[in-house]
Structures are given as structure tokens and as C-alpha cells.
Amino acid sequence: MSEMTPREIVSELDQHIIGQADAKRAVAIALRNRWRRMQLQEPLRHEVTPKNILMIGPTGVGKTEIARRLAKLANAPFIKVEATKFTEVGYVGKEVDSIIRDLTDSAMKLVRQTEIEKNRFRAEEMAEERVLDTLLPPAKDQWGQIEERDTNTNTRQIFRKKLREGQLDDREIEIDIAAPNIGVEIMAPPGMEEMTNQLQSMFQNLSSGQTKKRKMKIKDALKALIDDEAAKLINPEELKQKAIDAVEQNGIVFIDEIDKICKKGEYSGADVSREGVQRDLLPLVEGSTVNTKHGMVKTDHILFIASGAFQVARPSDLIPELQGRLPIRVELSALTAKDFERILTEPNASLTEQYQALMATEGVDIEFTESAVKKIAEAAFRVNEKTENIGARRLHTVMERLMDKISFDASEMSGQNVIIDGDYVTGALGDVVENEDLSHFIL
């Protein structure tokens, strides 16, 4: 679980997302409150529930990107889902309970990785001994039983030194490692994922505990044996319990496109993929118990962050009960031409940096002048105004159009230095930006 302060979280998000200070503050406070709650004593800790967030803003302004970056910072079980993928219980399609099942699977991977890292030192020692046993087989007594290994013999120490220095890396040995689980792909109708999971687990259990002889280089054998030994040091039942605790106490669910499940107009009848989904989401957000293959998971303290453009629907079109479960509302503002300029240059791995790095692989040095960046930003902003406003995603389209010729010829331009200035941008984009019909089809 992340122990970063709200200011540190916002500072980290600032490196990747331009503007949207209110949204960054809201998620930073929510993430910090997870840590604060865990510092409380038990009777009070249980009463403190997370304040779920609803992010409202046009497409392409950073809602999903905030979630993506938050997942990396949180160091907690995290899952992002599209609200449109689900249907009401009893109809064909995914049930909302599968969100918690997927979140628990994600927690299992996270906790397993943490446990492996904790035991890595011991696993490395044991893997080293197994490689040395293969290189220098221990003596057997008259009954064929292996005598106690002498780890301090001179020869063994010489081989240990060579092994640690990498002198034996390319030597081939034959080792016994755990056989991979049988991968059985079962195609089942939507909504029956739980049954397929149980069948897959059953087939995997049939093959667990079996070993397989493999011939490989010592350097690869060490990696395989370290993973093998680390897996043996992990208690599966303890792992499941830790994963369930991580989900219940620190889990975060990001529900995108929630505006697409709002009821439209005075439509009457079974609305299984809209209002029905909202009704099914209610118990999850409010707090219920979901049965997963790892055990029962309570959702009382899972943080839910929902987002939507709300261009056709409004937040008030959500059913009142769900509105009440999303008390924190954050509006993200539409991006200006100035924001586009900053997006092109300021974030880590900005778009201009990406294109420079891609062309550098061909030996072409690309330089974007300030006037070029300004013209690109203006072009993207104008096309957004004239046609559909898709936010920062328009920059990808404009940049691809701008770099089209250089990208095609780059393999024959090795060693050249290309300066992209305002005139170059006008020449490459001018006609398309000015002609509204062309903008519709090309940008």
C-alpha cells in the first residue's frame, strides 16, 4: 500500500498529466485516506468507509490516464473496467460480480510477487545448491541413499565461486523442475466464468506437484530454479488470505464510461445493460459479500472511482441510489490550445520525445522548434472545434499526419538532422486543417 502524501501523489501525476488539478487532488486525498484508515484502531477503522468519486469531463482530457497512473502509484489491488461490458444478472453477458473476482485475481498476482521477492534470497541460495548438486552429485551409501551433503569441500567452494562469477553460465546441465500446469482453455457462455474457473483449477490441480527433466544453460537454470524454490516457500492458503485482505482493505475499482449506462428518455421495458447494471452495481458499491474462487470477499471498504463524459446523459440520470454512493464529484475541464502545447513537451515520455526516440533508432535526429509545437497544438485545437472534440487524442492523429513522410523515408535518411519548424507544420497540415471536409475524414 502506498504511503505517499497527497502532495507527492499530485506531483507524480503532474509528470504525466497536464492540468486537471481538482481531479488529481480528489484521487490523491482518496488514496491517502486509505493509509490513514489503516492507522486507526479496529472498532473505528471498520466504520470509516471510502468516499467514492465520480469524475465528469469530456473525452480525452485525462480521466482514464489518471486511473492508469494511479494504479502504478497505489501499490494495491486495482482494476479498470468498462461499464458497458456488463448486463443485469440473469441475462447473457458479464455480471458485475466478476469485477470483484478479477480484482481478487489481480491481488493474488500482486501478493504472490511480493512474497516471491521476500523469499528471493533464500530461494537463490537453494537454487545455487541444486545447481552445485547437479555439477557435483553427492555420494551415495551402500543402500543407495544420498549421504549428507558437505557444503564446505574445497571442490564445491571452487565451483561455487565460478558459478557466482558467471564463469559457468553457458555450460549445459539437466535439472528437475516443476512441470507447468496443464493449460485448458474452456469456452463458456458469458456469465458462466465462475464455472470455467473451477474447471480450469481442477485440471491444474491434476498436474501440480509433478516434475520434469529439462536441459538448459546454467544461467537459465538458475532463474528457473529460483522461481521453483520461491514457489515452494509460499503457503498457498496464507497467500489467498493475504490477497483477500488486500482487496477488502486497499482494493480500488475504476469504472469507465459510466455515463453510457444511464437510462435514455422515457424508455420503458427491460433495460438490462443500463439501469439493470446500475442496480447490480449498488450492492457492490454499498458493501456486500462476493464469492470468488479464492474465498469470500467483502466490498465494504473497496474504493470505487467512476468516470464518464456525460455529453448526452447527465450525472442526475444515474439512479438516485447510485448517485448517493458517489459523493465526491470532480469536473475535468476541456483542454485549450495552451494545454496541448504543454502536453506535447512537458510530460515524461511526451509525444515529441516518443517520435524523436523512434526516429533515432534509424539514425535520424529530429528537432521540434517552439513555433512547430505551437502550430501543432493550434491545429489539433482547431480540428477539435470544427469536428468532434476528442481532446488530447487528436494530437496523436495530427502528429501521425505530420510525421508521415519522415517516418516513411527514415530508413534512407540515416545521419541526417531534421528540424521541424512552424513552416514545416503549416506545409504538412495546412490544407487538411483549413478544409473542414478533409478534417472530418483525415484528422
Swiss-Prot record:
Pfam families: AAA, AAA_2, ClpB_D2-small
InterPro entries: AAA+_ATPase, ATP-dep_Clp_protease_ClpX, ATPase_AAA_core, Clp_ATPase_C, HslU, P-loop_NTPase
Taxonomy, superkingdom: Bacteria
SUPFAM superfamilies noted in UniProt: P-loop containing nucleoside triphosphate hydrolases
Gene Ontology CC: one annotated term: HslUV protease complex
Record-level Gene Ontology MF annotations: ATP binding; ATP hydrolysis activity; peptidase activity; proteasome-activating activity
Keyword Ribosomal protein among UniProt keywords: no
GO biological process entries: protein unfolding; proteolysis involved in protein catabolic process
Keywords of the record: ATP-binding, Chaperone, Cytoplasm, Nucleotide-binding, Stress response
Residues that hold ATP according to the record: 18, 60-65, 256, 321, 393
Alphabetical list of SMART domains matching this protein: AAA, ClpB_D2-small
Subcellular location, record wording: Cytoplasm
NCBIfam families: hslU, PRK05201.1
Described purpose of this protein according to its UniProt entry: ATPase subunit of a proteasome-like degradation complex; this subunit has chaperone activity. The binding of ATP and its subsequent hydrolysis by HslU are essential for unfolding of protein substrates subsequently hydrolyzed by HslV. HslU recognizes the N-terminal part of its protein substrates and unfolds these before they are guided to HslV for hydrolysis.
Record-stated family: Belongs to the ClpX chaperone family. HslU subfamily.
Assembly with partners or alone: A double ring-shaped homohexamer of HslV is capped on each side by a ring-shaped HslU homohexamer. The assembly of the HslU/HslV complex is dependent on binding of ATP.
Protein name: ATP-dependent protease ATPase subunit HslU
Naturally occurring in which organism (per UniProt): Histophilus somni (strain 2336) (Haemophilus somnus)
